[in-house]
């Protein structure tokens, strides 16, 4: 293998290739299909943001377009912020970004219990003037990229079948994941903890950690999860409401879930029609947030659900395609991880609103209201698009 090929495989580029005027821009075009899918999901999310939020926005903000305008504003800002990275960023620069993002997210998670804003009895947000961010969301991206960097750097040691393989392939990645999980748990963010844990295990598995260690960790995590539920009163309350939904207080802890199920059940095959939801009139609380999927079901019916789920499925398939053809292992693991993150959050949100799992307060990517979350989601897709420019597939 010549020096140039070796540098490409390691995600490192020579000074000549970095600074040459002819190569100033990233070398190829972005993956067009992935870009179109992201645009389609975002447009769908924009439309449903207005439809689901109009009544609530009129009641509390005297402006039915309040959340819609926020969505458009943050979407435009996200695109403007992300576009330069897509065009200019090179794989070795994303490696530097991974280290910085992991350090920043760890620091922010440490600050949440101290200066975080409390909503619903939990501290998950930090405000910087008019903008609020959820550090656990940044931590998910940071963990994916940092583990991708680590697993690609120590690939040979991870592949060892002895103690070295356990130390480099299991112990250290587990510590990196576990630290963020513990810090997230301090903010009473169970869904964030679950996703961070699953992302960590996913990257470890794809990155080459032995299956026996993965299975052992899954067993330990399951035991730890049961213990947490027994120890934490708020977690136990949600689990008991989920198990005994028919006996739970329909005007109290079970209200949101039951009203969401009513919305889903009333949609039928074709739905009531866009904008014609009944449940958004104060029945489903803040319908533009975590339970926006129920409004999609009610207004667009089963056909609308198939379209939404189909778009997310296409995004996952195309994301995996980009990951498979990425220029090096770091880029590949990063694309796999960021794609899996979207898939996990989508599946968990749908599972919550359909009462297949306890209500954990998890948003539907690209649909649920939240400016900083939307900007981060667009940026994540931008990372994948940036890497797609270096695809090994000839175009």
Please annotate each region the language model reported.
Residues 1-25, 347-395:
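A juxtamembrane structural motif centered on a specific transmembrane helix
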Residues 22-38:
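N-terminal membrane topogenic signal
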Residues 39-43, 51, 58-256, 294-355, ...:
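Hydrophobic alpha-helical transmembrane segments of multi-pass inner membrane proteins, especially
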Residues 129-139, 186-188, 268-273, 362-376:
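Glycine/serine-rich anion-binding loops at beta->alpha junctions
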